[in-house]
């Protein structure tokens, strides 16, 4: 399944949340796009709620359906913890997500582009795979030439706080995943139990 390349604001308005995390998509029109947008969010069925939550989480992290489902299945094989929370932890451990959490990018989409274009290093070695799974203790940095990119400097300047599961050295412009995230440190708008219910019916 190909990745959606249309305007992200349309998806954000349809779901009623900011998928980029900036809030800009909903600043002017906090309702779904289209002629009936202001009145289009009625009460969803149980099926609709589960699908809505699954799509919201998938689009938030920018994965296609195959990638998303594969990661969900992997999370189910982890013996300790809850399936839904383990799934979200795996999403957070993606390299593009850690780059975003460190403040090197203002959105996950921008973080994914930085990884794809070869600007990001893991333990000093260039990694250009956004889905690369970061382990606790690994250091995420920038190639020397990339440290002067204006978009990265702008992102760092705009970053006012970082979650406690990462640390960042402003001078070296690199950060570390110091531990796995807790549930309250991940996306609060998501009800992961609905995502689990959705896939349990399909798998």
Swiss-Prot record:
Gene Ontology CC terms: small ribosomal subunit
Keyword terms of this UniProt record: Ribonucleoprotein, Ribosomal protein, RNA-binding, rRNA-binding
GO molecular function list: rRNA binding; structural constituent of ribosome
Pfam families, per database record: Ribosomal_S4 (PF00163), S4 (PF01479)
InterPro entries, A to Z: Ribosomal_uS4 (IPR022801), Ribosomal_uS4_bac-type (IPR005709), Ribosomal_uS4_CS (IPR018079), Ribosomal_uS4_N (IPR001912), S4_RNA-bd (IPR002942), S4_RNA-bd_sf (IPR036986)
TM region(s), chain numbering: none
GO biological process: ribosomal small subunit biogenesis; translation
The keyword Cell cycle is annotated on this UniProt entry: no
Keyword Ribosomal protein: yes
Domain (S4 RNA-binding): residue spans on this chain: 93-155
Assembly information from the UniProt record: Part of the 30S ribosomal subunit. Contacts protein S5. The interaction surface between S4 and S5 is involved in control of translational fidelity.
Function of the molecule: One of the primary rRNA binding proteins, it binds directly to 16S rRNA where it nucleates assembly of the body of the 30S subunit. With S5 and S12 plays an important role in translational accuracy.
Matching HAMAP family: Ribosomal_uS4_B
Family of the protein in this entry: Belongs to the universal ribosomal protein uS4 family.
Name of the molecule in the record: Small ribosomal subunit protein uS4
